[in-house]
A protein has these predicted regions:
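Membrane-embedded alpha-helical segments of integral membrane proteins
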Residues: 1-29
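Amphipathic, cytosolic membrane-interfacial segments at TM-TM junctions
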Residues: 24-45
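Internal/C-terminal transmembrane anchor helices
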Residues: 39-64
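Ser/Thr/Pro/Gly-rich low-complexity linker/stalk segments immediately outside membranes or between
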Residues: 63-77
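Metalloprotease/metallohydrolase-associated module, dominated by Zn2+-dependent proteases
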Residues: 73-90, 95-97, 108-115, 120, ...
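Short acidic, glycine/tyrosine-flanked loop/strand segments centered on an H-E-D-like triad
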Residues: 117-134, 158
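Active-site recognition of the HExxH zinc-binding catalytic motif
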Residues: 140-153
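A short beta-strand-loop micro-motif that forms or neighbors metal/cofactor-
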Residues: 152-169
Length: 231
């Protein structure tokens, strides 16, 4: 069933007593009895007070699973990552064209610019990443998702390469380089998923793995997070 339809049904069921109380209040109010209308307003107030925290909690947990939280991991932890680290919640479990062999990973490029110092790192977010079945033993699916992490690291290193080649510290220019790297990384990630069909096209998956590994090796000297300017 469509997840939006499910949400609509849940709200209708939750608020059905509210609608019934409103009907009774309007009916009584027309007869000159205003007490039911006052009771309805009070009932509505408490209903809203309950549902708003529930919605907020629902939204927070959908974004990040704080009930089973694991802090973001830097790229040096790459080899340790397995589907056990995918702790994100999906209240309405998704699938890929009906196939339960499905997962997604959340990564980011984080930066900090201080006086004459720039720190840039790629992060994998366990509590925002999701796998349909944690006990899946699909090595192909895990490899596909982990290469998303490598791609983020690749564009992090590309940004560090460009920043390292600046003649002097320039905060505005550095921010532009990082923003462009983030945009290029997002575009590359989308193309990767499209070309590999989320790991199902094995030949494309292997092509991307070879390309990404090769580029990462070429940028090995930029794996350290911190860049310092001495001018």
């Amino acid at each position: 069933m469509n997840e939006y339809l499910i949400i609509t049904l849940i709200f209708l069921v939750y608020f059905s007593p509210v609608f019934y109380q409103l009907y009774l209040a309007i009916k009584e109010n027309k007869g000159g009895n205003t007490i039911p209308l006052k009771k309805f307003k009070k009932f509505l107030k408490y209903s809203v007070m309950i549902i708003i925290p529930v919605i907020i909690g629902f939204g927070l947990l959908s974004h990040t699973n704080y009930l089973n939280y694991e802090k973001p991991l830097t790229f040096d932890k790459y080899e340790q990552i397995s589907f056990e680290n995918f702790r994100g919640l999906e209240f309405f479990k998704k699938s890929l064209y009906g196939n339960e062999r499905f997962a997604y990973v959340v990564t980011s490029i984080e930066s900090e610019i201080d006086d004459k110092t720039v720190t840039i790192q790629s992060f994998f977010h366990p509590s925002r990443s999701f796998v349909y079945k944690k006990n899946t033993n699909s090595k192909e699916l895990l490899a596909h998702e982990k290469y998303h992490i490598k791609i983020t690291e690749l564009f992090t290193r590309k940004a560090k390469e460009k920043i390292s080649k600046l003649n002097k510290f320039n905060g505005k220019k550095i921010e532009e380089i990082i923003r462009q790297a983030e945009q290029d990384e997002r575009n590359f990630q989308r193309q990767y998923d499209y070309d590999t069909f989320h790991s199902y096209v094995l030949s494309e998956q292997k092509r991307y793995e070879k390309e990404v590994d090769s580029l990462l090796n070429l940028l090995t000297e930029y794996k350290e997070p911190k860049i310092e300017f001495n001018d």
